């Protein structure tokens, strides 16, 4: 029915009339009479059937409902005895669906659930009254919908006079939301059933998460940015919040336009109106016509051609609706600049060629989801003290909805005022079946699909998260061709019933549950509809046996998906059970609890002479298939995917069979498989997985016909000795890992990109290896017979990863230039000279007993980021490392004595994370340890400067760590103590904005020298306290060691762990809130040693230390005057700066020590650095006078500092370091 603004009814009743739907025998002389009186006293026009002449037909009452603005539906005990009441309710439901009516349900001494679910005597009376009536289904829908609207309940304890006042208040509130009739700015379609009886203030829940959505949409409509007329599409899945967003947009933007209109519920209205009424409705609103029966569409054009208009069209569902409005939309585009049109739809294809831009409404985030759910779950009880007790359960419901606003509203509403037991029960029910109110939303979109699209949607649900190509292949081999399958996937994507992400077809969890509900309902009906059997209880417990034995039901089964992990009891199949399943397309017996599918106890017993005449089957997955071959009557003519892992098969089938559609075959760990002759005609095969087929000795020569084969996995085929000569032009990945008897590798494809030959018996690579110009990864790990790498490898210009680990006889690596080689693993080889490849980023030389030193030129490998030297037991020294090195692991280099000075070059703009590990380097000399600590100090200084300069130190993260044998905290740490806990009193303003991070140190000792660990991690819990606050402890990493590749090791010596972390968030909060205040503050630190996730009691922190690291302001004298905080105990004494570089007090001012390589300075009143005429100390001895060249450098640095040339100073400083 149309809205009242364009009604043709003459002598309309008074404006905003209220219609009361009730059972007269129950309420007319009592409650309703009082209610009518109260409404009239509040100047509200009210209509009840007493006003109609006796004998008037029911159609007159239904017309009055159409003409009304608000309906009060009063449900009482005998309501369902009256067919008139129920037919009125049906009309009320239709009008609310159209958006022309506000319904307020009143439950008179009845529970809303009794009405909604037609329970008890109320339901019995309905069933008796409606028996045999064809309208029964529509009536039930009305009972299901109307009680879900927020209404008013009157129980035995209620004071009826108070409830009457409450109803009057609700009516008055609802009336304020309905625009005056004839208003040219009216919304076409009133409040509908969305928020009847709520005040505008209560609608704030509609905006949870909507602020950002509205902002993003407004950016696309921006009138300043886009001067011309602009049409925007708002798209998203059903129930995602498009209508809410558009109403909010319309409310915000309507005042910016001289003419504006919103037409909502176009999908519903189009079912009840002729399509040519849509443009009439729109023109009527824009033309300020009270009764817009516009026959000549050109008339309004001349009136409005020079006006800017805003048009919002909500819930457009079909192309015909767009076409009906096309002329007006074209006119708007050609009219005055600045007009805006917004079209909301759940079908993106409808916006193609029409809109200038599209805004896709996304799911709500977790915070907004929780707020929206809580609002509806506690709508009348937001301050409920028990609300927190429901938080954990709330998380479960929010997770279930996955950010879907309508689902959150529905679930919250269904749980409102319910007990915790009810909440728990509801969650269990949702695991089995979704809420009917959520299903109904998706059902509308599903019903509009074609039959082919419905089948595709339900099929895709069976294979969600699979590759798009795989899904399309399954669909294409069904009733659809290849083009039709791709079209079906695109159409469902456009309608937001599925989506593609990273090449996979995905489906929202709610839609997935909806699809299963559809199949479940089909299974519970007479079996005439095709269906897919999902749940094991429906398949096993009276399901599959019953279905297989019933010819009609069996013939309509489209798919069986049985999770063997859910099967508890032994089940036996008869040899003839599959005979009647002529339409079966998908048969899948799998195990969800074991991804490898290797530990399943198969409880499905199969007879030896099983009949399997499944001509239509597309996908056959059968874990641990027990027969030696597939039955003779099995016809793979339509088979696309065959997966029989851990089977007892010796061959696929006897003889040759046509397999024109077969693209994927997986027979992994079928240990008895000895022949692949059945695949001779699989010319479209793309992937073949034969991993663990230990009996397979050879490949048939017919495999050369597989020109589309791209992936071949033969890992662990220990009996395989060779491959036939062939050219598989599409082959990209070949895996022969663990084929221990495979001796000679023939080049079977020039297009291989990934080649795994690890664990084979090959002794050399093929002579024509250079043909593999697309080869990216070559893995030859554990090829013990391999003695050399041919120089021809240097011609593989695409090679990026070369793995030669544990090639025990490999002694020489050729001098080659592989320009793109990034990863080179030579661990466990006998190579004596480290190769130098300019592009290498990851170099592993661990477990090499031959290398005694590294080439000096390693410092020039600017791309090297990871150098692994573990257990290089002959290595005695290391040279200077390149500046970009992020990880050096020298664990267990027991002969290592010296390191270069400097250890590594440091760039002035250094921001890289880096870790240098020297654990169990038991012979490391003291000078080497001092260089490591000195490097750590310089690294902290430069990181503090760089991080502050380039990102403001906004990110809290671990930037540097090192560990080495030792028993002392380095002297440059200003706070230290014995033990694992450190209490520090900090000076006022310690948290100023120059604070860049914290340096931490721990000396760790092993209490049990025989203890072996695979991981050791040192962390510090940092907590700041002052007079007003106590922050939550912040955990900072100090350092760690991990034994990669498995195994354990001893950490016998005491070790020093040093770590630098950018300013923790808790300190930054302190800094931001109190940087101008002078609050004495103390910090508490506790250092802990863990073995991964839990504390390791066999390791003890002997000593620990802390320094706060500050970055110098750019307008100060020295870019590198990185200062460290000081010990309070020494800061008030007259001290001179010794070897520890600690604080000196001069004329009452604190002096911050700078890097010792600078001249000693004092700090003036203005905080700037002044040169002090005093002999500089070095290790307690007077420093010899420097040559004039160094003095000249320092003079030049001072001049450059005055001129602000910071970078130049940094470069000089790094050179001096």
UniProtKB/Swiss-Prot annotation:
Molecular function (GO) terms for this protein are: ADP binding; NAD+ nucleosidase activity, cyclic ADP-ribose generating
What compartments host this protein? Nucleus
Is Hydrolase tagged as a keyword? yes
SMART domains this protein is in? Answer: TIR
Q: Name one Pfam family in it.
A: NB-ARC
- Knockout consequences: Loss of resistance to C.higginsianum.
Database matches in InterPro entries? Apaf_helical (IPR042197), C-JID (IPR045344), Disease_R_plants (IPR044974), Leu-rich_rpt_3 (IPR011713), LRR_dom_sf (IPR032675), NB-ARC (IPR002182), P-loop_NTPase (IPR027417), TIR_dom (IPR000157)
Q: Where are the LRR repeats?
A: 260-285, 436-459, 614-636, 637-659, 682-706, 708-728, 729-749, 750-774, 796-818, 819-842, 861-887
UniProt motif Nuclear localization signal: location:
1170-1177
What's noted about domains in the record? The TIR domain is a signaling domain involved in cell death induction. The TIR domain mediates NAD(+) hydrolase (NADase) activity. Self-association of TIR domains is required for NADase activity.
This chain's function reads: Disease resistance (R) protein that specifically recognizes the AvrRps4 type III effector avirulence protein from Pseudomonas syringae. Resistance proteins guard the plant against pathogens that contain an appropriate avirulence protein via an indirect interaction with this avirulence protein. That triggers a defense system including the hypersensitive response, which restricts the pathogen growth. The combined presence of both regular and alternative RPS4 transcripts with truncated open reading frames (ORFs) is necessary for function.
Report what the protein is called.
Answer: Disease resistance protein RPS4
Q: Which gene encodes it?
A: RPS4
């Amino acid at each position: 029915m149309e809205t009242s603004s364009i009604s043709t009814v003459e002598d309309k009743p008074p404006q905003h009339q209220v219609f009361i739907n009730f059972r007269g025998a129950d309420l007319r002389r009592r409650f309703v009479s009082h209610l009518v009186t109260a409404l009239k006293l509040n100047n509200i026009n009210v209509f009840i059937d007493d006003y109609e002449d006796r004998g008037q037909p029911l159609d007159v009452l239904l017309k009055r409902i159409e003409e009304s603005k608000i309906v009060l539906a009063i449900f009482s005990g005998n309501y369902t005895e009256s067919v008139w009441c129920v037919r009125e309710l049906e009309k009320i439901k239709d009008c609310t669906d159209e958006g022309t009516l506000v319904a307020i349900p009143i439950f008179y001494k009845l529970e809303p659930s009794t009405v909604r679910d037609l329970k008890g005597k109320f339901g019995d009376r309905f069933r008796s009254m409606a028996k045999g009536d064809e309208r029964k289904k529509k009536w039930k829908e009305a009972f299901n919908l109307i009680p879900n609207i927020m209404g008013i309940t009157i129980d035995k304890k209620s004071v009826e006079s108070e409830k009457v006042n409450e109803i009057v208040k609700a009516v008055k509130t609802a009336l304020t939301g309905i625009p005056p009739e004839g208003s040219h700015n009216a919304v076409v379609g009133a409040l509908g059933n969305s928020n009847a009886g709520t005040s505008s203030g209560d609608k704030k829940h509609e905006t949870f998460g909507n602020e950002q959505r509205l902002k993003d949409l407004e950016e696309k409509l921006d009138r300043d940015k886009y001067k011309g007329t602009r049409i925007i599409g708002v798209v998203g899945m059903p129930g995602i919040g498009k209508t809410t967003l558009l109403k909010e947009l319309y409310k915000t933007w309507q005042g910016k336009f001289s003419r504006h209109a919103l037409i909502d519920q176009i999908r519903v209205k189009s079912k009840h109106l002729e399509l040519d009424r849509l443009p009439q409705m729109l023109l009527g609103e824009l033309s300020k016509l009270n009764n817009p029966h516009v026959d000549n569409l050109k008339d309004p054009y001349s009136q409005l051609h020079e006006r800017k208009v805003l048009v919002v069209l909500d819930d457009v569902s079909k192309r015909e609706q767009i076409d009906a409005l096309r002329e007006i939309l074209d006119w708007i585009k050609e009219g005055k600049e600045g007009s805006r049109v917004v079209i909301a739809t759940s079908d993106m294809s409808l916006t193609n060629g029409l809109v200038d831009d599209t805004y896709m409404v996304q799911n709500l985030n977790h915070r907004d989801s929780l707020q929206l759910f809580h609002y509806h779950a506690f709508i009348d009880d937001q301050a409920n003290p028990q609300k927190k007790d429901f938080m954990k359960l709330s998380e479960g419901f929010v997770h279930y909805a996955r950010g879907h606003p309508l689902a959150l509203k529905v679930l919250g509403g269904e749980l409102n005022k319910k007990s915790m037991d009810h909440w728990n029960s509801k969650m269990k029910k949702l695991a089995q079946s979704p809420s009917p109110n959520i299903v109904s939303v998706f059902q509308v979109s599903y019903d509009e699909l074609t039959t082919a699209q419905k089948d595709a949607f339900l099929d895709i649900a069976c294979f969600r998260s699979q590759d798009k190509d795989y899904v399309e292949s399954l669909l294409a081999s069904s009733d659809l061709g290849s083009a039709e399958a791709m079209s079906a996937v695109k159409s469902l994507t456009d309608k937001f019933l599925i989506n593609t992400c990273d090449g996979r077809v995905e489906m929202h969890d709610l839609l997935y549950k909806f699809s299963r509900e559809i199949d479940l309902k089909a299974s519970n009906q007479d079996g005439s509809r095709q269906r897919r059997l999902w749940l094991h209880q429906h398949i096993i417990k009276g399901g599959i046996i019953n279905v297989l034995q019933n010819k009609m039901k069996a013939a309509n089964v489209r798919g069986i998906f049985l999770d063997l992990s859910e099967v508890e009891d032994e089940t036996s199949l008869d040899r003839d059970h599959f005979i009647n399943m002529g339409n079966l397309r998908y048969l899948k017996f799998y195990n969800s609890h074991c991804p490898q599918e290797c530990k399943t106890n198969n409880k499905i017993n199969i007879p030896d002479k099983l009949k399997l005449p499944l001509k239509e089957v597309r996908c056959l997955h059968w874990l641990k298939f027990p027969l030696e071959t597939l039955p003779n009557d099995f016809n793979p003519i339509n088979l696309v995917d065959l997966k029989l892992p851990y089977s007892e098969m010796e061959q696929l089938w006897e003889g040759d069979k046509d397999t024109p559609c077969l693209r994927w075959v997986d027979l992994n760990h079928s240990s008895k498989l000895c022949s692949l002759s059945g695949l001779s005609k699989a010319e479209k095969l793309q992937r073949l997985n034969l991993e663990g087929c230990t009996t397979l000795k050879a490949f048939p020569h017919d495999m050369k016909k597989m020109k589309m084969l791209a992936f071949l996995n033969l890992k662990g085929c220990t009996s395989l000795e060779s491959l036939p000569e062939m050219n598989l032009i599409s082959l990209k990945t070949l895996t022969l890992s663990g084929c221990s008897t495979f001796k000679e590798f023939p080049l079977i494809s020039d297009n291989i990109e990934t080649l795994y030959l690890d664990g084979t018996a090959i002794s050399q690579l093929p002579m024509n290896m250079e043909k593999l110009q697309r080869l990216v990864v070559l893995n030859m790990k554990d090829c013990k017979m391999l003695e050399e790498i041919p120089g021809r490898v240097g011609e593989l210009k695409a090679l990026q990863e070369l793995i030669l680990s544990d090639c025990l006889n490999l002694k020489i690596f050729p001098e080659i230039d592989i320009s793109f080689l990034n990863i080179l693993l030579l661990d466990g080889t006998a190579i004596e000279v480290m190769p130098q490849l300019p592009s290498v980023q990851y170099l592993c030389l661990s477990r090499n007993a031959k290398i005694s030193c590294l080439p000096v030129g390693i410092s020039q490998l600017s791309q090297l980021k990871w150098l692994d030297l573990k257990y290089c037991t002959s290595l005695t020294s290391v040279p200077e490392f390149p500046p970009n090195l992020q990880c050096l692991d020298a664990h267990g280099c027991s002969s290592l004595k010296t390191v270069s000075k400097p250890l590594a070059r440091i760039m002035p703009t250094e921001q890289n994370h880096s870790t240098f590990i020297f654990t169990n380097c038991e012979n490391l000399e003291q000078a080497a340890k001092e260089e490591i600590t000195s490097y750590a100090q310089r690294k902290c200084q430069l990181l503090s400067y760089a991080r502050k300069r380039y990102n403001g130190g906004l990110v809290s993260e671990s930037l540097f760590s090192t560990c080495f044998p030792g028993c002392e905290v380095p002297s440059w740490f200003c706070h230290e103590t014995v033990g694992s806990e450190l209490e520090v009193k900090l000076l006022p303003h310690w948290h100023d904005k120059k604070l860049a991070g914290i340096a931490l140190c721990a000396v760790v000792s092993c209490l049990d020298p025989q203890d072996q660990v695979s991981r050791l991690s040192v962390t510090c819990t940092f907590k700041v306290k002052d007079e007003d606050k106590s922050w939550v402890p912040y955990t900072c990493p100090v350092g760690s060691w991990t034994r990669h590749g498995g195994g354990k090791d001893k950490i016998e010596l005491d070790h020093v762990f040093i770590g630098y972390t950018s300013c923790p968030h808790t300190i930054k909060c302190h800094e931001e809130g109190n940087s101008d205040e002078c609050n004495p503050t103390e910090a508490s630190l506790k250092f802990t040693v863990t073995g991964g996730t839990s504390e390791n009691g066999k390791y003890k922190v002997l000593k620990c230390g802390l320094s706060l690291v500050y970055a110098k302001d750019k307008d100060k004298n020295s870019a590198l005057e990185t200062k460290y905080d000081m010990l309070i105990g020494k800061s008030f004494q007259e001290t001179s700066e010794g070897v520890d570089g600690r604080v000196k007090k001069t004329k009452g001012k604190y002096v911050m020590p700078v890097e010792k390589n600078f001249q000693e300075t004092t700090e003036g009143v203005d905080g700037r650095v002044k040169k002090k005429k005093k002999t500089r100390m070095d290790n307690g001895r007077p420093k010899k006078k420097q040559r004039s060249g160094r003095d000249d450098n320092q003079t030049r640095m001072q001049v450059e500092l005055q001129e602000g040339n910071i970078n130049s100073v940094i470069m000089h400083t790094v050179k001096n370091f």
